[in-house]
Regions:
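C-terminal regulatory/oligomerization modules of transcriptional regulators
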Residues: 1-6, 119, 123-140
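N-terminal leader segment of winged-helix/HTH proteins
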Residues: 1-32, 136
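Alpha-helical linker/hinge and terminal dimerization helices associated
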Residues: 17, 21-24, 60, 102, ...
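DNA-binding alpha-helical recognition surfaces that contact promoter or target DNA
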Residues: 69
């Protein structure tokens, strides 16, 4: 665990908190050989059934170039495949049967981290945190 930082800067505090929370998920998912980012990509694509790289990037909120780097590793693991369209612009991604099997194993693990965070915060604070995070996403 990191030493908590106390700063008046919202951005710094959010980054530190996000890093700590990401570490919790990454440590739990490491047993399955994936990171939280990879899990997020796989589960979002699975929920979409099929998507282009651009559609998936928009859904997850990642820069397309960042997503492409992550996809290369996930595709090499056999969890996502590229389904070619008529031309390269029509290529779509989809989760493979191995990827769906991985999700069956990892969703309960992901949920256990969710539960741990909610328990640590208390249900009222957990709900408040989600409201605040949603509002922060709407800001521009």
């Amino acid at each position: 665990m990191r030493n908590p930082v106390n700063s008046p800067c919202y951005c710094l505090m959010l980054r530190r908190a996000a890093s700590s929370v990401t570490d919790m998920y990454d440590k739990t998912l490491a047993e399955y050989g994936i990171t939280l980012n990879q899990f997020s990509i796989i589960i979002n694509l699975n929920n979409m059934s099929m998507a282009t790289t651009t559609e998936l990037a928009q859904q997850i909120g990642l820069e397309r170039s960042t997503l492409v780097r992550n996809l290369k590793a996930i595709m090499a693991m056999g969890y996502i495949e590229n389904v070619s369209g008529e031309n390269e612009r029509n290529n779509h991604l989809k989760v493979t049967s191995s990827g769906r099997h991985l999700l069956k194993l990892t969703i309960p693990v992901w949920q256990s981290v969710q539960d741990k965070i909610a328990e640590s915060l208390g249900s009222e604070n957990a709900a408040l945190l989600m409201d605040i995070l949603y509002k922060l996403q709407e800001m521009e």
